[in-house]
């Protein structure tokens, strides 16, 4: 059986060491691909240009002496691996594909992430082939059995689902926001939101009479490290200050993260749509700088997935059977992003 595991360089701290779980996979005969940064656009072109010309030739060998920034008890890192980190490139996808089903998720398979809030969709059918194709583009080895995989066609489905990656996620979000009119609802649940064009699109939708609701992470915790609330708190406080009809609630975290990435478009005169997966609503995640995978679904309102998403959102918005969210005023923050 072919098993292919594709991951980001972050897991080996950009060449400073081979992470123990990755080593176990390799020893067990599983093909591991560490995503090559060269396949990803430069999100920080000034630094990346300098890095490519002056530093890249040095490589990033193992055997460092610097404390691990992500795991103080973990292996030491090198100066070269830290300099490679500063390119800020990432394979941020979270997908699983078997011959039976596929999963696209916002969740990392990571012990410290186990308490986070996330969303995922499991599906089968022809969309699995598109997902496989997008992943095989990242590996050098040829896998004829995987490449030739044909998913069983669905006899009947009440959901139209397509796999979207990188900039196509941005296009799907902006297109759905732009077509929303008075009487429609846009419900967003998000870990990071800061893209200016997207925020402006939401502001314009609100002015058209669209009900815009946003549940966002407070950006105050990251694996035991206290953060300053950026980008969400200043970005959304400014958005509401200029557009008071937009409704924002913070997900009240207690050391964990609200790691969800979901946009739910509840149109009054047509089927709803949902976009969910790995992509945060930031420039790096949406404008072809990170590798990202989402799905866009067209959802009939008598279908199970429509009801599941609607009930999920209303439950945490209204604090049904628990305390999940708080008003924006509790953590309102002046500032400009």
Give residue ranges: language-model regions.
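Charged, low-complexity intrinsically disordered terminal segments
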Residues: 1-337
């Amino acid at each position: 059986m072919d098993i292919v595991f594709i991951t980001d360089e972050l897991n080996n701290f950009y060449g400073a060491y081979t992470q123990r779980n990755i080593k176990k996979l390799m020893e067990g005969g599983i093909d591991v691909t560490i995503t090559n940064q060269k396949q990803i656009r430069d999100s920080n072109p000034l630094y990346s240009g300098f890095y490519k010309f002056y530093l890249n030739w040095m490589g990033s060998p193992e055997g460092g002496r610097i404390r691990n920034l992500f795991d103080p008890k973990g292996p030491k890192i090198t100066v070269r691996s830290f300099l490679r980190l500063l390119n800020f490139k990432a394979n941020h996808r979270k997908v699983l594909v078997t011959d039976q089903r596929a999963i696209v998720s916002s969740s990392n398979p990571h012990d410290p992430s186990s308490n986070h809030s996330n969303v995922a969709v499991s599906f089968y059918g022809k969309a699995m082939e598109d997902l496989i194709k997008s992943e095989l583009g990242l590996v050098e080895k040829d896998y004829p059995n995987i490449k030739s995989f044909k998913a069983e066609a669905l006899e009947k489905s009440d959901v139209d689902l397509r796999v979207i990656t990188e900039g196509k996620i941005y296009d799907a979000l902006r297109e759905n926001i732009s077509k929303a009119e008075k009487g429609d609802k846009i419900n967003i649940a998000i870990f990071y939101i800061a893209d200016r064009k997207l925020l402006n699109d939401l502001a314009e939708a609100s002015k058209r009479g669209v009900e815009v609701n946003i549940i966002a992470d407070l950006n105050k915790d990251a694996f035991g490290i206290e953060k300053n609330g950026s980008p969400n708190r200043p970005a959304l406080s400014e958005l509401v200050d200029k557009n008071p009809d937009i409704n924002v609630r913070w997900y009240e975290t207690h050391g964990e993260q609200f790691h969800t990435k979901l946009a739910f478009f509840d149109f009054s005169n047509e089927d709803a749509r949902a976009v969910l997966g790995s992509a945060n609503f930031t420039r790096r995640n949406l404008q072809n700088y990170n590798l990202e995978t989402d799905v866009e679904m067209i959802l009939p309102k008598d279908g199970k997935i429509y009801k599941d998403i609607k009930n999920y959102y209303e439950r945490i918005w209204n604090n049904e059977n628990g305390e999940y969210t708080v008003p924006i005023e509790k953590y309102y923050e002046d500032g400009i992003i």
